[in-house]
Amino acid sequence: MSEIIDQFYTPLLIEHGFIHDPDNQQYGALGDCWKLSPEVGEGSYWTYGQKDLYDIKIHNFSFHEDFMLECSLPECLSITRYDSISGEELSPYRRLSAGCIKTFIGGYAPYKALIHKNIPIRSVGIEITPAYYEEYLKKLYPEAQINPVDAFRKIDQTSDFPEMSRLLTEIKDYRGEGIAAKLFYEGKVAEAVSMVVEYQKKHPDKPAHKLSQQDIENLQIVAAYLSDHYAFDIPLDRLTQIACMGTTKLKSCFKKYYDCTITEYVQQRRMSQAEYLLAYTELTVGQVAQTVGYSTSSRFAELFRKSTGLLPLEYRKNAQRK
């Protein structure tokens, strides 16, 4: 078993209401399965690790009440795909979204997130430790000039990484045993790291452009305007006037400062409000769609499912469950 699991995740799981469930082999004979105490929530958390090199995690659980997670993660590099999620990362603030590949660099700043009650967290991820990317890889490939930390940081969060999504699905669906399973997981971890490094090569950094204080203030005004008017169709030329920037500069500066496009920013605001309306009002799906800015409920349902992993009525059923 992985040292990071024994020393960090096991105490964290116990602290937050998980119970060791050694007889549960729904994800295969290898690894350890945990289940949430009925008083706290429901579902399972599966982990498999190899010494101090890496671990693999599969989540499928939900909490009965909104859950605040705050912890200092050990030094590591992780890559995860959420198939269902509802919540927000708080430092820095960003909405958690399903259907994307997300990386995280552990060991630098505390991780803080708010997870919404009753909405299932379904995810699969890989985590590698410094013993893997600073020692093991360099020992195997001493001539290679790679920086895994920069490569993982480059990805951050993207919906355009289909090969990684397929690999994580293969891990989630695998049910092997013994040495065959150990070799399978070891191979998939190496393949994932290879994909991350290749992704960095295919997406080289563009020359850095430092934002001026005036640019930052103008972007914050644009973001505030979008937050107040997210339900409307906002012409781009109005935003360029507000920002005192040309179209190209506005798009690039907004992406640089907020780490998302203007369209993605608006959609995140719409989905956050839609989640609230579905959970706490009796508005129909069509009424929710119109309230947050979509003319058809079918388009809204498609985007909502892409964002949370659930259809609107599925989300409401879970969120309003007592």
Which functions belong to the PLM regions below?
Residues K249-L250, F254, R299-F300, F304:
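Short hydrophobic/aromatic patch on the recognition helix
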Residues M1-L30:
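Short Lys/Arg-enriched alpha/beta "domain-start" segment
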Residues A301-K322:
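…primarily DNA-binding HTH/wHTH and HhH modules…
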Residues N24-R122:
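N-terminal functional module of multi-domain proteins
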